């Protein structure tokens, strides 16, 4: 009995300490163990947020992402290796399998050394493209740190990013300047809806290898906002993969550094706060949606009895109500989900195609969830229909709910009477006019017999 109680207490403590909604086991892969001390503030912050950190070299024989067919870790943080590959346990196939098993990954790159072919192949699988020159970095002659990169201009100074669009939530915004040394440039494929830029390069930036001569404009592959500094991939299973172009931005040095832009003032960096936002989103501390109760029923004036909720069969032209409860995870607690101002959470009432597509409106809320509702009339079409909520937005986990119901015709005793249908009044009037005319004719016939003629007798 005591050991059961002890296990229960341990489980509760672990649940309280683990801020991530998907687990606390974090594997950090770094090639050189001497570099571990350069990121001590990052490790301390992650441990303070409840993560259980494990450090492994990509060359380690004990390294494995899976145990008995299941994930051995919940999250993966890969620092750029100095060798050509990541070892037999971290091939592109193994990493993609980890992603398909709902694992979350942060991949950090660096312009200090050329990117390995294994990482390039992995990113190509995700439609993220690196520069053809593996040693290229992002240069900007207008947004650089004059204190540390007065000549090379390879330490970018950027503002924290705003929301991607007005209908997308902002998870990485805020005040302050980010210092991003020696960024490895990356571009995103245009066909995938699963990719989203977190932080783009300024319009004055371009990518080139500083070891070579200054290129002509025709030799530059990508410039400006085509270049991404930080990119995000959210798979269809809502697993997350973040590509950070500058691993040096996570070092203790840049967490507490002061920088100065051209013609600007000396200001402290906000790299530490941005690192928390970035790892928090990737490891599912933010942007996680959860669906609670889903209810649908016939519209009534009063409260709905439990046995009347979620019926399997509706009738055509029924007034119907649909409710869905949605929560959002924010670091350590569930809160009511609020749809961005220019976005809509929608319900589709669909058979082969939607017969109704309706915006769901917030109707009530609790401390942990918000209830969205709508009311509509079932279509004049019988068949198998579905209540479907399909909400997929950048930086938010997917909501895909589908509940099937049957819609039937009127029963023989449910059709409206003919006198209740205004379109039938003319036919009813014609019927009664014929009956009335016939009765009038009968009366006239019966009471209008011809008189007999009185003829005189003649001999």
Task: Describe the role of every protein-language-model region.
Residues 16-459:
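Short, surface-exposed patches at the edges or C-terminal ends of soluble domains, predominantly
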Residues 1-16:
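Fungal secretory targeting signals
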């Amino acid at each position: 009995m005591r050991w059961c109680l002890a296990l229960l207490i341990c489980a509760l403590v672990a649940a309280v300490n683990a801020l991530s909604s998907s687990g606390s086991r974090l594997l950090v892969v770094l090639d050189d163990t001497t570099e571990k001390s350069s990121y001590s503030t990052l490790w301390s912050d992650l441990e303070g947020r409840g993560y259980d950190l494990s450090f492994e070299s990509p060359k380690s024989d004990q390294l494995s992402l899976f145990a008995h067919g299941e994930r051995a870790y919940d999250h993966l943080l890969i620092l750029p290796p100095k060798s050509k590959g990541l070892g037999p346990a971290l091939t592109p196939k193994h990493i993609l399998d980890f992603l398909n098993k709902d694992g979350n990954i942060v991949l950090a790159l660096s312009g200090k050394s050329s990117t390995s072919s294994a990482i390039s192949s992995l990113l190509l699988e995700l439609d993220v493209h690196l520069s053809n020159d593996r040693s290229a970095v992002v240069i900007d002659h207008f947004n650089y740190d004059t204190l540390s990169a007065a000549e090379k201009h390879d330490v970018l100074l950027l503002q924290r990013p705003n929301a991607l669009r007005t209908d997308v939530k902002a998870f990485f915004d805020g005040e302050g300047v980010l210092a991003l040394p020696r960024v490895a440039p990356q571009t995103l494929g245009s066909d995938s809806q699963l990719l989203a830029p977190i932080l783009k390069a300024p319009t004055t930036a371009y990518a080139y290898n500083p070891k070579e001569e200054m290129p002509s404009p025709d030799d530059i592959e990508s410039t400006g906002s085509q270049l991404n500094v930080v990119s995000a991939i959210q798979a269809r299973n809502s697993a997350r993969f973040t590509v950070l172009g500058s691993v040096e931005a996570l070092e203790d040095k840049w967490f507490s550094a002061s920088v100065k832009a051209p013609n600007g003032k000396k200001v402290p960096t906000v790299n530490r706060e941005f690192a928390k936002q970035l790892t928090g989103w990737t490891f599912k501390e933010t942007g996680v949606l959860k669906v609670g109760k889903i209810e649908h029923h016939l519209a009534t004036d009063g409260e709905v009895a439990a046995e009347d909720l979620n019926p399997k069969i509706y009738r055509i032209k029924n007034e119907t109500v649909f409710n869905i409860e949605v929560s959002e995870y924010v670091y350590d607690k569930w809160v009511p989900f609020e749809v961005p101002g220019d976005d809509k959470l929608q319900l589709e009432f669909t058979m082969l195609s939607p017969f109704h597509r309706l915006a769901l409106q917030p109707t009530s809320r609790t401390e942990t969830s918000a209830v969205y509702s709508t009311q509509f009339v079932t279509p004049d079409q019988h068949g198998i229909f579905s209540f479907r909520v399909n909400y997929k937005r950048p930086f938010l986990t997917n909501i895909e709910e589908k509940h099937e119901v049957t819609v039937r015709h009127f029963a023989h005793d449910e059709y409206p009477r003919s006198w209740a249908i205004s379109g039938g009044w003319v036919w009813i009037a014609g019927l009664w006019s014929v009956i009335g005319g016939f009765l009038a004719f009968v009366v006239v016939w019966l009471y209008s017999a011809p008189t007999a003629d009185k003829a005189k007798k003649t001999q």
